[in-house]
């Protein structure tokens, strides 16, 4: 009985082998599309609060989603407030009011004080 031909063993799961493709003349290399996220900022805040703690990519994805959600809610509420008051510009006042409306009690107070601090720091650096 003939033995089946042995083929090269399949690469192990997770092995990273570079696959090189020859590029023809005139072909343009495709640039990787940039994906914006808040991950570097979340990481910086994490290191300020808990310097010895890390974060998984799944948790980072959740945090990114959370920040995007809060951003959209605040922007939407601020836009509504500007529209109600017949204003065409969203100022720090609309943002502050939107934060007070959206966030509960103590959290809103802390957010407003941190926001005021950030705006003051920005205007003084100009």
Swiss-Prot record:
MF GO annotations: DNA binding; protein heterodimerization activity; structural constituent of chromatin
Entry keyword set: Acetylation, Antibiotic, Antimicrobial, Chromosome, DNA-binding, Isopeptide bond, Nucleosome core, Nucleus, Phosphoprotein, Ubl conjugation
PROSITE patterns from the UniProt entry: HISTONE_H2B
PTM entry text: Monoubiquitination of Lys-121 by the BRE1 gives a specific tag for epigenetic transcriptional activation and is also prerequisite for histone H3 'Lys-4' and 'Lys-79' methylation.
Keyword Acetylation found: yes
Cross-link (Glycyl lysine isopeptide (Lys-Gly) (interchain with G-Cter in ubiquitin)): 121
Low complexity: compositionally biased ranges: 1-12
Keyword Ribosomal protein: no
Quaternary structure and partners: The nucleosome is a histone octamer containing two molecules each of H2A, H2B, H3 and H4 assembled in one H3-H4 heterotetramer and two H2A-H2B heterodimers. The octamer wraps approximately 147 bp of DNA.
UniProt-recorded name of the protein: Histone H2B 1/2/3/4/6
Higher taxonomy: Eukaryota, Metazoa, Chordata, Craniata, Vertebrata
This protein's encoding gene: H2B-I
């Amino acid at each position: 009985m003939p033995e089946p031909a042995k083929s090269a063993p399949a690469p192990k799961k997770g092995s990273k082998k570079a696959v090189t493709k020859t590029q023809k003349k005139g072909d343009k290399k495709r640039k990787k599309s940039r994906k914006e996220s808040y991950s570097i900022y979340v990481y910086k805040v994490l290191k300020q609060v808990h310097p010895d703690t890390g974060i998984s990519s799944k948790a980072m994805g959740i945090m990114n989603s959370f920040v995007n959600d809060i951003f959209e809610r605040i922007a939407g509420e601020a836009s509504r407030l500007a529209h109600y008051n017949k204003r065409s510009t969203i100022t720090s006042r609309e943002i502050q009011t939107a934060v007070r409306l959206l966030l509960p009690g103590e959290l809103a107070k802390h957010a407003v004080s941190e926001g005021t601090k950030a705006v003051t720091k920005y205007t003084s650096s100009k």
